[in-house]
Amino acid sequence: MSIAIPLGVTTPDTSYSDMAAGSDPESVEASPAVNEKSVYSTHNYGTTQRHGCRGLPYATIIPRSDLNGLPSPVEERCGDSPNSEGETVPTWCPCGLSQDGFLLNCDKCRGMSRGKVIRLHRRKQDNISGGDSSATESWDEELSPSTVLYTATQHTPTSITLTVRRTKPKKRKKSPEKGRAAPKTKKIKNSPSEAQNLDENTTEGWENRIRLWTDQYEEAFTNQYSADVQNALEQHLHSNKEFVGKPAILDTINKTELACNNTVIGSQMQLQLGRVTRVQKHRKILRAARDLALDTLIIEYRGKVMLRQQFEVNGHFFKKPYPFVLFYSKFNGVEMCVDARTFGNDARFIRRSCTPNAEVRHMIADGMIHLCIYAVSAITKDAEVTIAFDYEYSNCNYKVDCACHKGNRNCPIQKRNPNAAELPLPPPPSFPTIGAETRRRKARRKELELEQQNEVPEENPDPQPQEVPEKVTVSNEHEEVDNPEEKPEEEEKEEATDDQENSAHSRRTREDRKVEAIMHAFESLEKRKKRRDQPVEQSSSDIEITTSSSEIVVGEETKTAAPESEVSSPVSNVAIPSTPQSTGVNTRRSSHAGDVAAEKPIPKPPPAKPSRPRPKSRISRYRTSSAQRLKRQKQAIAQQAELSQAALEEGGSNNSVTPPEAGNTDSSGENRQLTGSDPTVISVTGSHVNRAASKYPKTKKYLVTEWLNDKAEKQECPVECPLRITTDPTVLATTLNMLPGLIHSPLICTTPKHYIRFGSPFMPERRRRPLLPDGTFSSCKKRWIKQALEEGMTQTSSVPQETRTQHLYQSNETSNSSSICKDNADLLSPLKKWKSRYLMEQNITKLLQPLSPVTPPPPSSGSKSPQLTTPGQTHPGEEECRNGYSLMFSPITSLTTASRSNTPLQFELCHRKDLDLTKVGFPDSSTHSCADRPSLLNCNHPDLASHPSVVPTSEAGFPSRSGDGPQTLLRNSDQAFRTEFNLMYAYSPLNAMPRADGLYRGSPLVGDRKPLHLDGGYCSPAEGFSSRYEHGFMKDLSRGSMSPGGERTCEGVPSAPQNPPQRKKVSLLEYRKRKQEAKENSGGGNDSSQSKSKSSGAGQGSSNSVSDTGAHGVQGSSAGTPSSPHKKFSPSHSSASHLEAVSPSDSRGTSSSHCRPQENISSRWMVPTSVERLREGGSIPKVLRSSVRVAQKGEPSPTWESNITEKESDPADGEGPEPLSSALSKGATVYSPSRYSYQLLQCDSPRTESQSLLQQSSSPFRGHPTQSPGYSYRTTALRPGNPPSHGSSESSLSSTSYPSPAHPVSTDSLAPFTGTPGYYSSQPHSGNSTGSNLPRRSCSSSAASPTPQGPSDSPTSDSVSQSSTGTLSSTSFPQNSRSSLPSDLRTISLPNAGQSAAYQASRVSAVSNSQHYPHRGSGGVHQYRLQPLQGSGVKTQTGLS
């Protein structure tokens, strides 16, 4: 056969090995393409693969060519990559796929691609018309050009060009062939055969493909055998022993002649027996290189040997002249073929002839079959080698090329060919149901019938029934619609006839019309039956009809009566099929709803209108989803029609006797329901037309409106349901992501939506159920957002923020309903709405505060007494106790909870002075009553600690109550918190790591939260909880700190330990974003360390808290609390925050830190993935180390505190830093009370401290480096045996754990102090955290050793902690100190004087704290005070960060 060859390819010699790395383009594409396609299934790679891997060994390629008819990208690749032949791009070049999945090309590849693209453009321009015809076969059309591009791009550098090529031709094909292809396109989509028809019909396209195949193929030195062929061969060999002997002979042949052929495989035939000659521009033939005697082995036909059915998987072959496929059926009657389109040798150019001079014979060598071309007659040199047709050319729809002499008039092929061109058209008819032509013919037949029927009635003109004719017309139209085959042309014709008929109808008598209508009804029924038999056709026609009918409906809308009648008509649907024509679109659907029952007379619409819309609809049908919409709408309408049907049937049954005359073929009937005066006719028509009618009466707009209304109603339903509070972090994150109010604030970093999408992997039960268990968790839609925002502004006060927060954070398991009930009004509205409302309030008041669950809600700068938070918590704690939640869930507690839960909602509440005073009393009481729990006081009442400075009396009074109340609350909330936090934090991406570190460091995590709360100025139940945990739990946490789950326990969710893996994986973009943020933060020294902490994923924050916990978390729960990223929530941190809030600098720092936390919250909120941690672990720890070093350089040991202080104060002021340093030492001191009690525990279990520290380090907030330090910290804690000497033990632990991995950790340790003010403070404190932790430890040591509670004590504590810190940091934190100190130093340099002042102030605070909390010990007070100062500084840093 003549082979079309793309220009520019001189010889097939070019080894296609150059192409893709694979020897065989197909193999390359088949495997990589297939694999990648599966990988990139989203890009519809699967579509190509789908065809490609149909069990064919060469799945991708063979199917492609089969499917594409054209060489398909594979072939194109093969060819095109080779096309670049001269360029010979390494098949596997450095080019690779970027993470985006886009192919990155090397310069060579790029050049090649460009060249290829240009060449392809030129080629394809020639080929456009038909070249892709087969290429457009099912899969091509299935894949969008973009998809194709992806496929190629993904696979090989060359593939890109090929892809581009294919894509463009595809588009071109569509555009040029649209006219004729459009109808066929339907066919193509519906059936590959029709797609084939399209391609087959276009010889040009085929030629183009052949050209590609001609030049673009891979040289086959050996055959590729499909598994089926191999199996057949094995069976054959076993069954036929005779062949066993032949293999030797065949082997000889194979090794000699065949081998020789192989060696010569190049531009000319092997052994020079044959050579490829370019006969025409695009055709090559195989000529004898010399005179060949009879039975001479000319060449082996090599390629992909497969069973014929495999090759013809799609049955496309005979639609296209696949020139490079050899069919062979003489082997055991097994029909096999050799596909050499993309992988073959020169034998592929052998053409078929009616007078062949060679034949194909098979030889079996090595157990494999070889198809060889033998001369069947003497072949002279340069004579073309031809073989007989190995396929039934008479079945081909395309012009078959015969190699015989063109002058041969006897050539049967040539004789057949003239018809061949026509054949393509006939084949579509062969698929009458599918063929567009078939539809047209049917439509024409119907038209003819209708016309005839109409003519009959016209003979009996009756002027009166014009309305009735209209009805008839409607039914006719329905029929037309029913006929999917009816074409716009036919419609136009019908319209013309309709116009005539309309006039005629008026002349017809009622009886005639009735008769016609009845006839039409029967006809339509029959047609419907036929259609049902042809479901495929029906589906396509339905789409068309639906579109057209909808348009018609629009036309009818002008006539409201018609639509109504149509709606009613569904009843009579069954009766009258005649309506189907008009309802054709509705036919199948119309069956659901009666079509037009023209109860009301409607003026005939101009027939032209209906016809016009129909064509449009048909056109749009393929391009738009309007058809689908219409289907949906019609379905809805059908239902409605069914409802109305009953009524219509009642009325229509009376008139059901005669449908409007079917004869009325007014295609312009325009769905007019027969509104003839004759009720019977109307009813009959209605019943028959009902399907179409019900749909027609409603325009698209109407339908859409109804649909939207229904949809809206459905949406409203979930609102009625009580909100289900989910602690699942994924759900919360999703909710937060959806919150309109939060969306605006960068403060809220919710879990990446892709996390949410998959649900929390650690909650299989939750995973099973939709992440959004309630309608309340609906997707955030603009409309909802707008409503929420608008309503939120007006309705924000509708429900107490506390209550709302509770609902948000209450676990589904806990008393959701109770709290939800409270918010029923809000809950009635979509969750987003009330959330947005609440957030609006929050945004108005505290949107700047960090909203991430990890970050505490920043206390308002204005809120001067952390008590506000604490009191709020106290009441909430009570409420929580009632609700089964710990304080965390109380409205005020929800402040803390909010912080934990990523809800900034409670910030204001936290800062409410009145609440603080009252509620602080409660938490304070519990705290004080727990004298054994200095940690509780510290942890739970860092606020109180700060409060003493603010409201000494209330704080003094509250401590005892605080101890009692918090204990009770803690107990009550303990369970709640465990549940809530286990769920929330164990599963929250933020807490996943903290839980891992601090499962049993849950206290530290709580402490961390508490420090967050400190910033927030609240003692959350979590704080109390953490304090309890710190006492009772810290040991557990310490023990469990080693366990990843421990961190979750720290979260206040001891049960979360098994979920440490819950660190959510972050998308690459997110990861980069975080990393960049970390870098930016690191750029600011303290801020950088802070942001790093955030980047590390609050992980460092956690580590900071961990360090704190380790340093003083061991001492007390407060220390433990600070360890978690929630340090702010931790009591000690809370107290620090409260102190900060109390002191102007503190409050200022707090506000700043809140601002920063907001900035940082995004990073904190997102827990870095383990990979991210590993990636960032290097950079973040390095940055932290560098900052520490800088700080150390400024002040090796004392500088630690001063650096820390500076660092913390830097973010805020010179004052801030001083308070920070003093706060650090104070924090150490303050924490030492907490720590002290905890240290006592730790003394009991030094391991506990280390574990808690580890947990802290493990905390996701800390970041993985922190985690590893945390573990080392634990190890250190255990090793030093310093737990007894809490300060030293913690210091040593911090030092040990932080030495290298812990740089961030030590920084984090400082951060706990500095971090106390805010989650982010911990980051800024990262550098400081080392010193801070050390001072804390020192302070804790001093705390452990009775230290004056007076101001002098604070200074002493500070000095002790400083000295201790200095020692520890220099000893164990050298790196950390360096990393932390550098930032600290940077910070310090600015506010040294300020630091001194702040430090003094912090000491003063500490003194006041000690005064207020004498039982704690001045060290403890100092720590608190210092921490608050620190907090202010930290807050500042936090704010900066």
From Swiss-Prot:
Query: Which tissues carry this protein?
Result: Ubiquitously expressed.
Q: Where is the composition biased (Basic residues)?
A: 165-189, 611-621, 1062-1076
Q: Biased composition, Acidic residues: where in the chain? A: 450-461, 479-501
Residue stretches making up the SET domain: 269-390
Q: Which GO terms describe its cellular component?
A: chromatin; euchromatin; nucleoplasm; nucleus
Tell me if Protease is a UniProt keyword of this record: no
Q: Annotated Gene Ontology MF terms?
A: histone H3K36 methyltransferase activity; histone H3K9 methyltransferase activity; transcription corepressor activity
Extent of Polar residues compositional bias: 190-202, 575-588, 652-683, 1144-1163, 1265-1275, 1319-1333, 1373-1382, 1389-1412, 1429-1441
Identify the InterPro entries for this entry.
Answer: SET_dom (IPR001214), SET_dom_sf (IPR046341), SETD5_SET (IPR044433)
Specify the signal sequence span: none
Xref: PROSITE patterns:
SET
Could you say what a knockout of this gene produces?
A: Mid-gestation lethality due to severe developmental delay such as vascular abnormalities in the embryo and placenta, reduced cellular proliferation and increased apoptosis. Defects are probably due to a widespread impairment in the regulation of gene expression. Setd5-haploinsufficient mice display altered neuronal network connectivity leading to autistic-like behaviors. Haploinsufficient Setd5 cortical neurons show reduced synaptic density and neuritic outgrowtho, with corresponding decreases in network activity and synchrony by electrophysiology.
Keywords for this entry? Chromatin regulator, Chromosome, Methyltransferase, Nucleus, Phosphoprotein, Transcription, Transcription regulation, Transferase
Residues the record lists as Phosphoserine modifications: S72, S829, S852, S1197
State the coiled-coil residue ranges.
none
Q: What SUPFAM superfamilies does the record point to?
A: SET domain (SSF82199)
Assembly, in brief, is:
Interacts with components of the PAF1 complex (PAF1C) such as LEO1, CTR9 and CDC73. Interacts with NCOR1. Interacts with HDAC3.
The molecule here is called Histone-lysine N-methyltransferase SETD5
The organism encoding this protein is Mus musculus (Mouse)
